[in-house]
């Protein structure tokens, strides 16, 4: 009898630890612009709000998770959202919140002798294979009056970029400003950032309307602003 009771209690405890199957699954990666969502999670507000934060190491993982039906919502840039909708006709995406506008948080770092954008000709540049990475690279090329054929472009997720730069596999890298100190310790200099592209890089909270109803969308916005005011 004691053994049966113990097993029953263990089963109840395990069931209690299972994620809510009805919770909205929001995909994100650790980026400063998404901090209110992480704060809400740390404060224990997400579960009571019917939200489950699903963290990925890179934006590429978030996009893959959304395409594969593992997410109902995500923190993305505007261009990534448009590319996601274009690549997945079964999604019915809606942007419910603009979370921030980049003003220096996305940047291009390079080592000497690269000091200007024009100096990038013939250099190896690392960039994450996302819509944001492609967009930022295209704007760099515009500003430098170069073409893609003038560079050697290597696809690198953010978490591999510092190591690649330190190993001298790349000469320049498009990345988040948060990677700056680690890159600068390896001799990199910031030569271009999103301050030169005002209003062009926008982070948003996007949902799939098939799985997130209007009431839940309002709750998501309220959760964000509650955390922002904390």
Sequence positions of predicted segments:
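Bacterial N-terminal signal peptides that target proteins for export
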Residues: 1-6
């Amino acid at each position: 009898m004691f053994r049966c009771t113990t097993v029953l209690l263990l089963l109840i405890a395990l069931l209690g630890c299972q994620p809510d199957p009805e919770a909205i699954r929001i995909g994100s990666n650790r980026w400063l612009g998404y901090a209110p969502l992480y704060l809400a999670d740390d404060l224990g507000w997400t579960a009571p709000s019917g939200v489950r934060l699903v963290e990925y190491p890179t934006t590429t993982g978030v996009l893959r998770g959304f395409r594969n039906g593992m997410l109902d919502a995500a923190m993305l840039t505007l261009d990534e959202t448009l590319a996601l909708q274009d690549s997945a006709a079964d999604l019915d995406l809606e942007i419910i919140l603009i979370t921030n506008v980049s003003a220096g948080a996305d940047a291009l770092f390079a080592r000497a002798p690269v000091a200007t954008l024009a100096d990038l000709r013939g250099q190896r540049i690392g960039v994450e294979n996302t819509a944001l990475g492609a967009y930022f690279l295209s704007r760099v090329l515009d500003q430098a009056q170069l073409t893609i054929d003038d560079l050697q472009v290597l696809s690198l997720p953010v978490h591999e970029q510092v190591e690649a730069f330190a190993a001298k596999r790349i000469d320049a890298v498009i990345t988040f400003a948060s990677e700056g100190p680690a890159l600068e310790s390896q001799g990199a200099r910031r030569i271009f950032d999103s301050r030169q592209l005002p209003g062009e890089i926008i982070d948003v909270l996007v949902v799939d309307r098939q799985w997130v109803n209007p009431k839940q969308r309002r709750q998501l916005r309220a959760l964000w602003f509650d955390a922002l005011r904390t």
